[in-house]
A protein has these predicted regions:
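Active/ligand-binding-proximal structured segments within catalytic/core domains
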Residues: 71-85
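Residue-level preference for non-acidic, small/hydrophobic
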Residues: 59, 78-82, 168, 245, ...
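Bacterial Sec-dependent N-terminal signal peptides
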Residues: 1-37
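Solvent-exposed loop/turn segments at secondary-structure junctions
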Residues: 57-59, 69-72, 111-115, 142-145, ...
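Beta-lactamase-like hydrolase cores
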Residues: 24-70, 89-92, 129-134
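Conserved serine DD-peptidase/penicillin-binding transpeptidase domain
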Residues: 87-322, 440
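Small-residue-rich helix-loop
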Residues: 62-64, 292-441
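Short beta-strand scaffold segments in enzyme catalytic cores
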Residues: 51-53, 97-99, 399-400
Length: 441
């Protein structure tokens, strides 16, 4: 090796060491300043709080507070579901599996939530069935789970955020009831006869309530408000699926008991990114749960949430620090438990996988602009926070990406559990500290 080469090698080594020491110095200063924000906070001192701030460029945790303690993540769980989708269905969602036998077309569900979804309006699979020219037969039995996820609150069965899970969902698995000229407009039409007046109910608050075990919907004997709009989960069943399909396709759909063969073809439908965005921006629990069944379709003849999660953890999350407890797709279950360090590690994996900030941030709520972060930060056309919120009773979290005035991108997880303060106070304190990071670094 010549003297010149030795000199260059030594210079490069010295330069690398200098950069490393410089980054460490900056990170230590940041850690001290962020820690001061927590120390002076009169809000976070009142409950169980966890925080992690991570630099993806240097792959270093800058600051942590209870970063290895487990928290109930609520809808931050959807970040796990999102990452799994980026890996398992990177382009389009499988809508149906099918085989053709003579004059018959036999099909199986994949869990695809976009079929006749009110927002996504995916009709590709329905057009395929309608135009097939063959006799149609639906083969149920792929889904081997319950209609609710592990650990869900069953008394929320009438609320829009807790639709049932099944293998061939249609129309969000939801009854839509709206006011129209003083009367009720009901969709899907196949369930109109299931909605009736309860003459004995004279409560002032107008609300449609379903019987827990069956599709019997009652509304009170009061005037329908002019702006009334309600979504009520309907009770899923194979018979209802067939009726909804037949009514939509305007042709009969038969029922057949048949195990899906290995050579069953796949009909792909809507682009995955549009489904991820529809899940992440409004925090759609229905889409999140159904996506786990879609992922299960990619690895098994059975549609099973537990098997899908186990596969994803082994194949894509094996390097995640800690031992995350992940039990559903949406975060409705309190059985989910993640640490702030695990959350920023996951965010880093998402960041690396997408490798395109414009594409990634378009699929996430933006602080002050869109989704569940729209009202968490001041209104703006130039958001600096992109991420996911998560809320249950006494739980409010936020994990995502913060862009700083100096042009840096940092990953953060802010987890707040077991508080009795108003959620608005917790939300405002998170915004204050994250905004401080944006402005100072």
């Amino acid at each position: 090796m010549t003297r010149k080469m030795k000199y260059l090698k030594g210079s490069l080594f010295f330069f690398a060491i200098t950069l490393t020491l410089s980054a460490c110095s900056v990170h230590k200063r940041m850690a001290r300043q962020v820690n001061k924000q927590f120390e002076k906070s009169q809000v976070v001192s009142q409950y169980h709080v966890g925080f992690a701030l991570y630099d993806p460029a240097d792959q270093q945790l800058i600051y942590g507070k209870n970063q290895d303690t487990y928290f109930t993540p609520a809808s931050n769980t959807k970040l796990f579901t999102f990452y799994a989708g980026l890996k398992m269905v990177p382009d389009s969602l499988p809508s149906l599996r099918y085989v053709e036998h003579g004059d018959s077309l036999i099909f199986w569900g994949t869990g695809d939530p976009s079929l006749l979804h009110t927002g996504l309006k995916n009709v590709k699979a329905l057009e395929f069935l309608k135009n097939s020219g063959k006799k149609l037969y639906f083969a149920p039995g792929r889904y081997s789970g319950n209609f609710y996820g592990n650990g869900w609150a069953w008394d929320d069965y009438n609320d829009y955020y807790q639709a049932e899970i099944n293998e061939l969902p249609l129309m969000d698995n939801m009854l839509l009831v709206e006011s129209q000229a003083g009367k009720l407009r009901i969709s899907p039409a196949a369930l109109r006869s299931c909605v009736s007046l309860d003459t004995s109910d004279r409560t002032t608050a107008f609300r449609v309530v379903r019987d827990f075990n069956q599709n019997l919907f009652k509304y009170p004997n009061t005037a329908v408000p002019a702006t009334y709009n309600q979504q009520v989960p309907f009770k899923t069943s194979t018979i209802l699926t067939i009726n909804l399909l037949s009514d939509t396709l305007k042709k009969p759909v038969g029922l057949i008991r048949m195990t899906m063969p290995e050579n069953a073809k796949t009909l792909y439908g809507i682009k995955s990114d549009s489904v991820f965005k529809a899940m992440m921006l409004p925090s759609d629990n229905f889409i999140a749960e159904q996506l786990l069944l879609v992922y299960s379709d990619r690895i098994s003849a059975d549609l099973n949430t537990t098997k899908a999660i186990s596969y994803i953890k082994d194949k894509y999350l094996s390097k995640l620090p800690g031992n995350a407890s992940w039990v559903d797709g949406s975060g409705l279950s309190r059985g989910n438990l993640f640490t702030p360090r695990e959350m920023v590690s996951l965010l880093d994996s998402i960041y690396v996988t997408v490798h395109n900030n414009q594409r990634l941030f378009d699929m996430l709520p933006a602080g002050g602009k869109s989704g569940t972060l729209r009202n968490a930060y001041p209104k703006t056309d130039n958001p600096f926070v992109f991420g996911k919120t998560g809320s249950l009773s006494n739980v409010h979290n936020q994990s995502g990406y913060v862009l700083t005035k100096k042009g840096k991108v940092y990953l953060y997880a802010f987890m707040n559990n077991n508080f009795v303060l108003p959620t608005a106070a917790v939300r405002a304190e998170m915004a204050r500290i994250v905004t401080y990071i944006h402005e100072q670094f």
